[in-house]
Amino acid sequence: DFDLNDTKNPKALLGMNKLDKDGKETEEIITQEVIDTMDDDTLYANLNALWKNFCITSTYEPGSVAKPFTVAAGLECGRLTGDETYFCGGSLWYGGHEIHCHNRLGDGMLTVKEAVEKSCNVALMQMGDAIGKDNFLTFQELYNWGLKTNIDLAGEARTAGLVYNSATMGEAELATSTFGQGFNATMIQMIAGFCSLVNGGYYYEPHVVNKIVSSDGTTIKNIEPRLLKQTVSASTSEKIIDYCNGVVTEGTGKTARPAGYAIGGKTGTAEMVPRNKKNYVVSFMGYAPADHPEIAIYAVVDRPNTLIQDDAKFATGIVKNVLTEVLPYLNYFMTEELSDNERTELGESDLAVKLPEVENPEDAEDAEGAEVQQEETTQEETPQESEEEKAWKERLATYETDPETGYLIEPETGALIDPATGQAVDGSSFMN
């Protein structure tokens, strides 16, 4: 046993991978015997890593959750109207590099809204062409990328050197920045900026609590909201809400929606450096209710512990589970009719109140997160088949077939998959 408030208790380290005194992770698992052999430098390197708050101290490439920011910048500076259409053929060339969309076969013609819903890299890069480097960098600063948020927690990371500037941003860097790759940010930077996109454009300094009270309940300090700036106009904010609502109803974020509620948001999948390792950060950034955002939520999964990492479902599932508990607790009432599956899932098939009928969006393939459609459980299961094998077969069952080759098409990368072996016979994704 150990006191969670005692940040220097070595027993908190039991079971984690040991770091050396320079903070590099080793393969050794910490036991009491290992703790007994640690010198002070190694011990404190491990304790500091254990209590580090990922949300404010760790940086990462945010990936496609940055796409609403790009669209908002284009709308706000007048380079986009929202009525544009773009053709995605699977890739574009910038600065001598071929940069791919998540769907190498291309998404075809897309509106601005559809580009956000399908998370199309190629469409976003074309928007970046219209926005231009100078405008993009102006809004990068408005969104507080590269700057501290000054949240009232210790250890917020400095990111000034982790974003591009006018001297370092070329056409390839601008292209990849439009979909959240090539620069680093913290979670608190991203969610604070996103809140401004969906609350009418108002950027507030983030705080952990709204007041401090004594043990007898006396208020010691009130922490009032502090408005710092306006990032976008109310009209731009309304459009971003509309686009992000579509991500959940029609696009890549369907699995984030809690039963009975309408929400909005954006999925993210970013390939980590070095790219050849195929490690990913997957995420979902969202809000509720969909028509009048009051709650923001952001889930980031750093290198999911699974064979196939580039699946936003790992993050959308977290968001769905959290909001399923949080929204009723905060007295938000269901607004959407429950399907039979949702009634069963909530364990309230006999108790759920039937709401006025609304049109439920049909299930569709997740263009970014390789969303796996739910299937009815069969009465018989093959005992020798592992859970990972079952999940992989279910995922393959959702893939479309290439009419020319007969191979399956992986929706995230456009790679061709041999249905007999499950192995790729084509290239793999560049970034998403």
Say what each PLM segment does.
Residues 208-432:
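Soluble, non-transmembrane domains of envelope/secretory-pathway proteins that act on or interact
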